[in-house]
Swiss-Prot record:
Protein family according to the UniProt entry: Belongs to the YajQ family.
Keyword Iron appears in the UniProt entry: no
InterPro entries: DUF520, UPF0234-like_C, UPF0234_N, YajQ-like_sf
Protein task: Nucleotide-binding protein.
Identification of the protein by name: Nucleotide-binding protein Shewmr4_3156
Molecular-function annotations in GO: nucleotide binding
Length: 161
């Protein structure tokens, strides 16, 4: 029986490239000349540091535009609400969503069941496996999940026939 997995993951190479491009843009921007600002990436967390809270927000915008240029969905970003003030600098932590949380996975399973498409879906850790008899049914589920607005992008992999 044909099946596929619904996953939500960020390509780490593209993420690293976007951070490097953001650093380059930061060094060439006129409004950051002479300012103490930096962008650092470590363990799926990007730390944005600047002298002012407003500049931290600008760094988030720079990172968001570079992510979209590298085809990394900006909706995977989880930005801290308030910047942390330590000494003379402000810092923001940006985390990236990896995997599908259980409540979102349950929403996907419920959405697939409510659609009356003849497939079975089950939660397997941070992925959702969808199995059906016809390939067309699986493609209909893919279209359904793409159209749903669940707050994070999904990829489909491990397609077996």
């Amino acid at each position: 029986m044909p099946s596929f997995d619904i996953v939500s993951e960020v390509d780490e190479v593209e993420l690293r490239n976007a951070v490097e491009n953001s650093r380059r843009e930061l060094s060439s921007r006129f409004d950051f000349r002479g300012k103490d600002a930096s962008i650092e990436y470590k363990d799926h967390v990007v730390t944005l540091t600047a002298e002012d809270d407003f500049q931290c927000k600008q760094l988030v915008d720079i990172l968001r535009t570079q992510l979209s240029k590298r085809n990394v969905e900006p909706s995977t970003m989880d930005v801290d609400e308030k910047s942390v003030h330590s000494g003379k600098t402000f810092s923001l932590k940006v985390r990236f969503k990896q995997g599908i949380e259980t409540d979102i996975a349950k929403k996907i399973v419920k959405m697939v069941k409510d659609s009356k498409i003849k497939v079975q879906s089950q939660i397997q850790g941070d992925t959702v496996r969808v199995t059906g008899k016809a390939r067309d049914d699986l493609q209909a589920v893919m279209a359904l999940v793409r159209q749903a607005d669940l707050g994070q992008p999904f990829q489909f992999n491990n397609f077996r026939d």
